[in-house]
């Protein structure tokens, strides 16, 4: 049994819709609060200086690069210019845009909360009831509130 094929236009429209949903999720995660952490985390999802090949911009650059290589098979006088333009576009996506996001993240970093356990300033540090005392004394209601990143919160809970 053959399933109906989508036209190229339908296939690309579906792909664009999926990308739009993903970008909407990134934007919503950042903007649901005034806290700096979610904003920085969303920017890192777009471009993470520690992992420049893993963010959204890297994926966009990769698609442009693959299309650039593929289009070289087209026999036309202007293909060399097309590939030059696409190479420039790829560079702008990851280098120029990524560099600006990297600078923005560097400016936001001092505003991030510092984890009380590991001392690092990370976007995912959250102020919470101490997992150690909460696990040992669940009946208590007045646990100390401390800023912890998820790995340190888990570690404190496991130590209880």
Located regions from the model:
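Hydrophobic alpha-helical segments that drive targeting, anchoring, or assembly
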Residues: 2-108, 115, 137, 153
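C-terminal end-of-chain micro-motif
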Residues: 1-3, 159-160
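Short, non-ligating residues that shape and space the ligands of small metal-coordination modules
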Residues: 124-125, 155-159
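Short recognition patches in nucleic-acid-associated and regulatory proteins
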Residues: 112-142
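Extracellular interaction modules
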Residues: 143-147
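Cys/His-coordinated zinc-binding microdomains
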Residues: 119, 150-153
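Cys/His-enriched low-complexity segments
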Residues: 148-151, 158
